[in-house]
Amino acid sequence: MSSTTMGVRLDEETRNRLKEAAQKLDRTSHWLIKQAIFDYLEQIENDQVNLGHSTVAEQDIDESTEIPTAHYQPFLEFAEHIHPQSVLRSAITSAYRTPETQAVPMLLQQATLPENEAQATHKLAYSIAEKLRKQKNGVGRSGLVQGLLQEFSLSSQEGVALMCLAEALLRIPDKATRDALIRDKISHGNWRSHLGQSQSMFVNAATWGLLFTGKLVSTHNEEKLSNSLNRILTKSGEPLVRKGVDMAMRLMGEQFVTGETISQALANARKLEEKGFSYSYDMLGEAALTEKDAQDYLVSYQQAIHAIGKASNGRGIYEGPGISIKLSALHPRYSRSQYERVMSELYPRLLSLTLQAKQYDIGINIDAEEADRLEISLDLLERLCFEPELAGWNGIGFVIQAYQKRCPLVIDYVIDLARRSRRRLMIRLVKGAYWDSEVKRAQIDGLEDYPVYTRKVYTDVSYLACAKKLLASPNFIYPQFATHNAHTLSAIYHLAGQNYYPGQYEFQCLHGMGEPLYAQVVGKIADGKLGRPCRIYAPVGTHETLLAYLVRRLLENGANTSFVNRIADTTISLDELVADPVKEVNRMAQAEGQVGLSHPKIPLPHKLYGDERKNSPGIDMSNEHRLASLSSALLTSATENIHCEPLLGDTFSSSEKTQEPQSVLNPANHADIVGTVREATEAEADFALTIAQEKGEIWFATPPAQRASFLIRAAELMEQQMGPLMGILVREAGKTYSNAIAEVREAIDFLYYYAAQVAQDFDNNTHRPLGPVVCISPWNFPLAIFSGQIAAALAAGNTVLAKPAEQTPLIASKAVAL
């Protein structure tokens, strides 16, 4: 999407009013102007403004006046790319990382069913689960894979070992490294404990094989066998396991993948289509890493739409097959930081695929991905909905994840979007498949909270609350409920009412996981079915493209909280299996004394290190509110006249300062003078060494706990100055914004870490200082390593002579000042 810079001349009074108003909101003047324009345009488009009564005197606006070319202003371009938001979009952003204690109580109110409806839901869910459990004891490929997953669950060491193998083997190109991994993961498993535990001959055979090969690959540690025999068995063992795991992966792959090609998948789907099921096909593959990847995925989608469209044969978007697409497959830089490229390069590809789908009248769903891509995907969706060529067509679909705290507000937004664009959107509601990575990423980035719920039962409650919202807007939303949970299915069945009509809503399930459950749903009521439609999400791809999708499915199946896993576990009663999540949350709240407490074993990101030390806070670069605040801080920091010189105290004679100040330039733009620096003379260096020696005893005598408190205070000051410190790093060191955040966080981490090292059990009598320590900073980590060296030396009781890299003196000076 191209952009144009437009301007208007303002008097000083108006400029000051803008600045003061923006500061009240912790925003920039540029953001406020764009937001005002956005809001006013929205009012005009909704016929809410009388243009005959302008509040601005027209004679004050001279549209013919050219805006003079301004001098370079640091971070102005960053500020210009902060997007104004509507009320609904702003609400979505605000809910990004809402504490669970705030989010869950609201969900409970929305998800609670009337008592008679709750009883009917439980009764139906119990009946479905009872029949399903009996079926799970049967045979067939589905039962074989289910048995293997059940026996080697992710709660066992052996299950984790298999998971590691499944996740890693296809990433390793050479056999030697693959064998080394097998040796590590298989040889330590207690496979004997699983022998004979399953009723499945297949599972027991697999266990025998793993037991045998586990011994083979560990024989180099078995003293009772000769070295020669060890070598023979080891050489034969690892390739044997590699082949065995490869076969197991292929078996599971056939369980979860409809076909290696779209034509094969369409042929394989006919059997269940004849029973009333429909399909949504997904071309397997993960995010594009190169432009060639993106073009290959685009061609794959085009060919699939053509084949699916021909197979649909005019059945339409609700009755016929459809396709699901991943936006990350269409562009290698699909992220908020590359917004303009996404809009100018990815969007045309999305539009072309959607127009092709419209030509065949098949539904096209935009798949959900990681949380940081949600809001940019909403921008793409909105633009798509207002395309004139797609007007009046209801085949556009979007996937929303119930485990995200923003989910209810996203639903409010898409309902409004459908209303404004005068169409009916297909909305697939899923629980979410990236939970592990979302939690880990928030911890790594030091964000204030998680974008997802930490307890699965909260996600179940969210799903019900969001399902109610979708069903309440039948004119604008075609709900697609993707679930394998009998209670969730039953609740939706009752929420939607008994007067079902074609096109009201549909259920969805994953190929290889949900067919036994939905065999009770799809079909005529006279045949004992529920008479509701189900669409199967059907992955298409080769064995090599299966890996990441298979891992997500294994995580879903192998998790102890998964309905698919628990249905086969006869130690879990059916009543427990189909328990109402709302009642379960209420029971937990009674026991814990508060509604919505997070998982006790998942600390918030800032508490990642427990009581030992605090995790350094980061900035979420996909959060428009955080970006606006950062923009304001960066623009303010750029107005500071930064000057640095040797810091020697007041005792050094100023007459000896002979060096002239030099300008420090932005390496990316020499028109940007970041500040000035006066370098130290030889006399100043000698004086600094003398002072460091003289003050050494005083600093060493300071109690370690007090030294630690000074470092913690410095860390807290750095946290408060994140924006200004980032600004200097970007301008002086040429850092990108994300690298600058990481740099400041690493410096803060060093301070907290070394403070924690000496805060307790550090004795000055046993840990003597070295004396004055010289810390020389590298230019590529001018704050982090600079601060880390100093923090370690100071914590241990040494005085420090700190010398920054000659390219980056300003950031070092700022750090020392703090």
Language model regions located:
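Terminal low-complexity tails and localization/encapsulation signals of metabolic enzymes
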Residues: 528-529, 541, 545-548, 552-690, ...
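Positively charged, amphipathic and often flexible ligand-engagement surfaces
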Residues: 60-617
